[in-house]
Amino acid sequence: MAFQGTSRTLTQQSSAATSDDLQKILFSPEAIKKMATECDLGRHHWMRADSAISVRPLVPEVTHGRIASFFKSGYDVGELCSKGYMSVPQVLCAVTRTVSTDAEGSLRIYLADLGDKELSPIDGQCVSLHNHDLPALVSFQPTYDCPMETVGNRKRCFAVVIERHGYIGYTGTTASVCSNWQARFSSKNNNYTHIAAGKTLVLPFNRLAEQTKPSAVARLLKSQLNNIESSQYLLTNAKINQNARSESEELNVESPPAAIGSSSASRSEAFRPQVVNGL
């Protein structure tokens, strides 16, 4: 008998219990931890000489098995119209270098299907980045939804593949790749418009930008001048040389007379500047 379901969401097609089960599979603390440790979702992956090729599935193996079992059980009893599909609207990778710009090397990043033994780029979506091009943002858009199935001993799903080339003499980390995506799961699938892989070069962060503003420069110079003035003319509690007075008298500098009995005259006597030998 043919399936006679209607076009409804997964939550509406299944009961509340099974919907809750799916939520637990996707968003349990264990599933979230697996997404970080196995897939590097939102984490920085370091490209080193001892890991020149990195293949990161977009769904952890354990989570994949549980989701596939959930859809299969619903399909077997006629509650769902398929055994489940994985949909990823977009994968965004932020790539930064961790060596100087004169290092000769490059990265090749693409999206692959683990159901393909050759791990070829999906629809030719592949980006090559030379070291001096970094930093950069790279985006991929799959053109189909991936069936939740097992091919041989491989759990079929999309994966981000990163290859490191060159960097002779650099055995440590030469680049950091942080990937983000949002996987969706449904009992229905679709095909999508083919969009070429996107590559956007990003200007490096200018951490001295604030110091180039006139106001910032003025504040910096003023603070430096104040420091110089303080270091030369501020005295400690040390006693003043008695010869300072005689030298000040020899300078013979006249100041405008102040009115007798005025407050300014008393202040000038109280705050009379002191001259120190050698200054």
Swiss-Prot record:
Role noted for this protein: Transports viral genome to neighboring plant cells directly through plasmosdesmata, without any budding. The movement protein allows efficient cell to cell propagation, by bypassing the host cell wall barrier. Acts by forming a tubular structure at the host plasmodesmata, enlarging it enough to allow free passage of virion capsids.
One GO CC term, this protein: host cell plasmodesma
Listed Low complexity bias regions: 254-268
GO biological process: transport of virus in host, cell to cell
Region Disordered: start-end pairs: 246-279
Compartments where located: Host cell junction, Host plasmodesma
Protein name (database record): Movement protein
Keywords: Host cell junction, Transport, Viral movement protein
Coiled-coil segments: none
Family to which this protein belongs: Belongs to the cucumovirus movement protein family.
Pfam families: 3A
Organism: Cucumber mosaic virus (strain O) (CMV)
InterPro entries assigned: MPV (IPR000603)
